Amino acid sequence: KQAMDYLKAVPNSIIQFDPLNPKYLDVLFKMFLHPLESMGVDFFWNDSTGDMDITKLWALNHYMYLDSGKNSNKRPMILARGGVLAPHRYPVLYGGSSEISWKNLKELPFMYLNAANIGVSWWSHDVGGNHGGIEDGELYLRYVQLSTFGPILRFHGARGKYYKKEPWVWDAKTESITADYLRLRHRLIPYIYTEAYNYTRAGTPLIQPFYYNYMWVYDDDLYKNQYYFGSQLLVCPILEPKDPVMNRTIHRFFVPDGVWYDLVTGKKFPGNKKYISFFREDDYPVFAHAGSIIPFSNRSDYNNIGLPTDLEIQIFPGVSNTYTLFEDDGITSLYKEGYYLKTSIDYNYLRNNYTVIIRSIDGKSGIVPERRNYKMVFRNTKQADSVTVYFNAEKLQSNNYVDGNDFIVEVSGVPTIGQLTINCKGKDIEIDAVRLINDDLESILVDLKINTYLKEEIDSIIFGDLSYE
């Protein structure tokens, strides 16, 4: 009633919203959005704008973005269905409603890469698809896994009691795997946030098409969907359902020059080679290059969105490298005034002697926790013969142990302003964890949906060292 009176509209009529009219914007912001913000709403989604004139849609995004950042206590943020001109300037984009299907899942990497090509790193889609189609757990998981290593992870779908968007409405296996990937995404926030900063400052896209460096894959259906996720990771999306007999997805991928490691298993893949591998529903092909330094949050209280006191840093052996972690409050615009902290993580690699130096290099104190607990995870690395830890000139105690193929050094209560130095010495420290075909085959045989006697015969032919009665 108040809005109708202000606009002098005919009572009970439908108002055609016009973002080019200042009075309409007054109604939108002062009578509708600002009261909702005062109730705790963080940002708004411009949806159902498909029929709006392009100029008006651009104006709507422009004014809503500016209004959402009207004070320095909160950064501007909107989610919009259309970006129109200069789409990288304003909203996080929403790809529209798509049918739930393997066909539409296959289109998503193409959209990721094309968005990156026009400077839009923050592009989103409905995890699991939006409407229609035939839902199944495997398809849902592949949506979740792709989105875990995508710009924006966002669950959404059409209304209806038969749609299954929430992880907990699925079977126990699907729910458990989904939860693992959602926790992994949360743990990766320090890395993703730093890569977002790099995009803002240097223009380096969060998603970089693989064909930037290997142009021949552009027209190759097997490899054209691969992409770099930030500076340290390579993603080779799974877009096909599994083979019903093997209970695995048969997937081909290309590993670029150098040495690469499976992010989860740590298996080693020599580069500049094509591979074929077999992936269970809980597996996803994501690789870190030799020397990769990846910061993870190591907190157990997953709902805490503050900067973590516990930080896990995974380092893959073989090459020296430096990674600069960027942190700020994540909410306000005070980072523009220098309220942030940059922390350099230097990895100096020798086969028998490697050192990690963590030191604050730029910004202000008081941004991150005063002290931190560091868990250094040296992937595919044997236990060192000796470990020495210093903070500045003070020698510290550490907890050192082996977990599978990884060597762990834990140091607690380290001040975040200053220099932490960890030196490890040992003979032939790197574990040669090259992907073992025999391990893959044996694992596949276990899951094959064939007669068990036939499994034993196949095993005997392949391995030749087992006998059965």
Name each region found by the language model:
Residues 290-394, 413-469:
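Accessory, solvent-exposed terminal regions and/or long lumenal/extracellular loops of proteins
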Residues 233-234, 352-356, 407:
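Hydrophobic residues embedded in beta-strands of well-ordered beta-sheets
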Residues 224-225, 251, 343-345, 398:
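Residue-level detector of beta-strand structural context in well-folded domains
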Residues 261-281, 386-412:
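Solvent-exposed beta-strand/loop surfaces of large extracellular or lumenal domains
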Residues 219-221, 247, 280, 339-341, ...:
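Residues that act as N-cap/strand-start positions at coil-to-secondary-structure junctions
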Residues 63, 69-76, 96-99, 104-111, ...:
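Conserved, charge-rich beta-strand/loop surface module that forms ligand/interface-binding patches
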Residues 228-229, 255, 349-351, 402:
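Generic beta-strand structural signal
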Residues 1-289:
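Catalytic-domain carbohydrate-binding cleft regions of carbohydrate-active enzymes
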